Amino acid sequence: METNNEKSSLDPMFADAARLVVAEQDGSATRLQRHFEIGWNRACRLVEQLEAAGIVGSNRGAKGREVLIQDLAFLEQKLQEIEV
Protein backbone atom coordinates (compact mmCIF):
# COMPACT_ATOMS: atom_id res chain seq x y z
CA MET A 1 0.00 0.00 0.00
CA GLU A 2 1.29 3.45 -0.83
CA THR A 3 1.77 6.20 1.71
CA ASN A 4 0.20 9.64 1.36
CA ASN A 5 3.51 11.03 0.09
CA GLU A 6 3.69 8.37 -2.62
CA LYS A 7 0.07 9.00 -3.64
CA SER A 8 0.58 12.74 -3.85
CA SER A 9 3.72 12.24 -5.93
CA LEU A 10 1.86 10.31 -8.63
CA ASP A 11 1.71 12.14 -11.92
CA PRO A 12 -1.70 13.78 -12.47
CA MET A 13 -1.88 11.80 -15.71
CA PHE A 14 -1.28 8.46 -13.93
CA ALA A 15 -4.85 7.09 -14.14
CA ASP A 16 -5.26 8.09 -17.78
CA ALA A 17 -1.89 6.55 -18.62
CA ALA A 18 -2.85 3.33 -16.83
CA ARG A 19 -6.12 3.13 -18.76
CA LEU A 20 -4.33 3.65 -22.08
CA VAL A 21 -1.67 1.05 -21.30
CA VAL A 22 -4.25 -1.58 -20.35
CA ALA A 23 -6.61 -0.79 -23.23
CA GLU A 24 -3.82 -0.91 -25.81
CA GLN A 25 -1.72 -3.58 -24.02
CA ASP A 26 1.32 -1.42 -24.72
CA GLY A 27 3.41 -0.29 -21.76
CA SER A 28 6.00 1.73 -23.62
CA ALA A 29 7.10 5.24 -22.76
CA THR A 30 7.05 6.03 -26.48
CA ARG A 31 3.34 5.18 -26.67
CA LEU A 32 2.57 7.47 -23.71
CA GLN A 33 4.75 10.23 -25.13
CA ARG A 34 2.98 10.19 -28.48
CA HIS A 35 -0.56 9.74 -27.19
CA PHE A 36 -0.42 12.42 -24.49
CA GLU A 37 2.06 14.68 -26.32
CA ILE A 38 4.39 14.80 -23.32
CA GLY A 39 8.16 14.78 -23.01
CA TRP A 40 10.31 11.68 -22.80
CA ASN A 41 11.25 12.20 -19.14
CA ARG A 42 7.63 12.51 -18.02
CA ALA A 43 6.65 9.44 -20.05
CA CYS A 44 9.45 7.45 -18.43
CA ARG A 45 8.40 8.59 -14.94
CA LEU A 46 4.84 7.49 -15.71
CA VAL A 47 6.05 4.05 -16.80
CA GLU A 48 8.11 3.76 -13.59
CA GLN A 49 5.02 4.67 -11.55
CA LEU A 50 2.96 2.11 -13.49
CA GLU A 51 5.60 -0.51 -12.69
CA ALA A 52 5.60 0.39 -8.99
CA ALA A 53 1.79 0.02 -8.99
CA GLY A 54 1.99 -3.43 -10.57
CA ILE A 55 0.36 -2.41 -13.85
CA VAL A 56 3.38 -3.08 -16.06
CA GLY A 57 6.34 -5.37 -15.58
CA SER A 58 10.00 -4.49 -15.41
CA ASN A 59 12.02 -3.26 -18.35
CA ARG A 60 12.83 -6.05 -20.83
CA GLY A 61 15.02 -3.95 -23.11
CA ALA A 62 13.94 -3.76 -26.73
CA LYS A 63 10.95 -6.06 -26.08
CA GLY A 64 9.11 -3.41 -24.09
CA ARG A 65 7.26 -3.88 -20.84
CA GLU A 66 4.69 -6.58 -20.26
CA VAL A 67 1.27 -5.24 -19.28
CA LEU A 68 0.29 -7.19 -16.16
CA ILE A 69 -3.39 -6.22 -16.13
CA GLN A 70 -5.56 -7.41 -18.99
CA ASP A 71 -8.95 -6.11 -17.92
CA LEU A 72 -10.08 -2.47 -17.60
CA ALA A 73 -12.59 -3.36 -14.85
CA PHE A 74 -9.78 -4.87 -12.77
CA LEU A 75 -7.66 -1.80 -13.46
CA GLU A 76 -10.42 0.50 -12.17
CA GLN A 77 -10.57 -1.56 -8.98
CA LYS A 78 -6.80 -1.27 -8.60
CA LEU A 79 -6.94 2.50 -9.16
CA GLN A 80 -9.54 2.78 -6.40
CA GLU A 81 -7.24 0.84 -4.07
CA ILE A 82 -4.43 3.27 -4.89
CA GLU A 83 -6.97 6.09 -4.40
CA VAL A 84 -6.13 7.81 -7.67
PLM regions: where:
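C-terminal intrinsically disordered, low-complexity extensions immediately downstream
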Residues: 1-84
